[in-house]
């Protein structure tokens, strides 16, 4: 009886203590300033009505532009809302995770959780590193929930070498990195792709860091 009671108390204590290991979610954007972020805020990134906006609908964006966090993250649940619109050329955006700035360039190097037609939504592309698609999203599932030209919810879960993407609750990919040499930490970033007249809007950016 004493052994059973002891084991129960140990289980109860561990169950109560477990939530304290999970960090609370916090906002990445204050809605007013670029505090905690860096990029070309003189030309390609701005704040409008409490949202981050990248790009232009009247000028062709000559090269990829990224707004990046000033600190690194490893394991996390990242949530945000995005809206992608465009008038001409390649209309595309994305969210960088576990990435690095490329010296003397506007680029970032690392995993990009993509945004855009025809089938980039929710896919993972290795930006400025392996330069190839690492995981194609389930477009059959995403097409049922996507709101093109309107606001969509993006959730990205990075845990160990596993990365999962969700758009409006539907899973895009479940990818596990096979190359043990690649860093599983780095900066976050949001992109407006070069080669088009397009705008990417972002709001409600928050992150919950995981152990």
Task: For every predicted segment, state its role.
Residues 6-17:
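Bacterial N-terminal signal peptides
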Residues 1-4:
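Positively charged n-region of N-terminal signal peptides that target proteins for export
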């Amino acid at each position: 009886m004493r052994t059973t009671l002891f084991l129960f108390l140990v289980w109860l204590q561990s169950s109560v203590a477990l939530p304290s290991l999970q960090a609370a979610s916090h906002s990445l954007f204050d809605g007013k300033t670029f505090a905690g972020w860096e990029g070309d805020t003189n030309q390609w990134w701005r704040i409008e009505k409490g949202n981050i906006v990248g790009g232009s609908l009247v000028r062709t964006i000559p090269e990829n532009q990224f707004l990046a966090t000033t600190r690194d993250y490893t394991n996390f649940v990242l949530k945000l809302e995005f809206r992608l619109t465009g008038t001409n050329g390649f209309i595309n955006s994305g969210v960088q995770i576990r990435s690095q700035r490329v010296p003397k360039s506007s680029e970032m190097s690392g995993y990009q959780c993509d945004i855009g037609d025809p089938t980039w939504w929710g896919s993972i592309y290795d930006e400025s590193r392996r330069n190839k698609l690492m995981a194609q999203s389930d477009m059959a599932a995403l097409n049922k929930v996507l709101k093109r030209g309107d606001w969509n919810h993006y959730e990205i879960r990075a845990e160990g070498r596993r990365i999962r993407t969700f758009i409006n609750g539907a899973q895009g990919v479940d990818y596990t990195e096979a190359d043990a040499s690649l860093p599983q930490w780095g900066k976050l970033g949001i992109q407006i792709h070069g080669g088009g007249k397009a705008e990417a809007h972002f709001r409600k950016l928050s992150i919950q860091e995981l152990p």
